[in-house]
């Protein structure tokens, strides 16, 4: 691990690290040989045919971009004296800005906001939560579900993308529900 934006140092005792921050933020990077807590897989389809990113570049047609997430962090918790194996509750938000070469943009498990020139797409997924709760989509009404993927479809001319971004929070409790109205969902709160 190395400090990338300062001279602050840390001391280490086993896996515990203590930084001498003097009240300042620390920016660091490092490498690990451990599996990431969540694996993200991005798949691209053109007119229903799966393609590699370099194959789809420059092509036109009905494009689908699917973000699948696999939660790799299981833990054991005890509730009322019984032990349960549950996934760490991660909430993942994936977003992108699509230019005007993308039309008829739709997203599963997300929202599309257009300013006339660009479409901002934000999707939310909570991989592993259904398994931890031992529920399936059929346990919910059609208006409620626990999303585990994000899928964007659009008609595209000369496909290219600048970037996508994903943010992962360890638990949905980091979101504030204070202003969530009865008719809204967590996605509405995130996309405000």
Segment roles from a protein language model:
Residues 190-191:
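Hydrophobic alpha-helical segments, chiefly the membrane-spanning helices
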Residues 178-185:
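Conserved small/polar residues in nucleotide/adenosyl-binding loops
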Residues 1-174:
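N-terminal, leucine/charged-rich tether regions that mediate assembly and partner docking
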């Amino acid at each position: 691990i190395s400090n990338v934006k300062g001279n602050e140092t840390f001391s280490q005792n086993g896996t515990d690290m203590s930084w001498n921050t003097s009240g300042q933020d620390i920016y660091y990077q490092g490498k690990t040989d451990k599996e990431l807590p969540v694996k993200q897989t991005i798949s691209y389809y053109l007119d229903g045919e799966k393609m590699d990113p370099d194959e789809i570049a420059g092509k036109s047609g009905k494009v689908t971009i699917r973000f699948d997430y696999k939660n790799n962090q299981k833990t054991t918790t005890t509730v009322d004296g019984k032990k349960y194996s549950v996934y760490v509750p991660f909430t993942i938000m994936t977003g992108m800005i699509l230019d005007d070469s993308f039309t008829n943009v739709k997203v599963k498990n997300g929202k599309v906001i257009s300013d006339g020139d660009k479409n901002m797409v934000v999707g939310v997924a909570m991989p592993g939560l259904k398994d931890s709760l031992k529920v399936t989509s059929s346990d919910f009404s059609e208006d409620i579900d626990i999303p585990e993927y994000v899928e964007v479809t659009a008609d595209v001319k000369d496909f290219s993308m600048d970037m996508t971004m994903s943010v992962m929070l360890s638990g949905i409790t980091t979101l504030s529900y204070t202003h969530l109205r009865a008719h809204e969902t967590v996605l509405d709160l995130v996309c405000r």
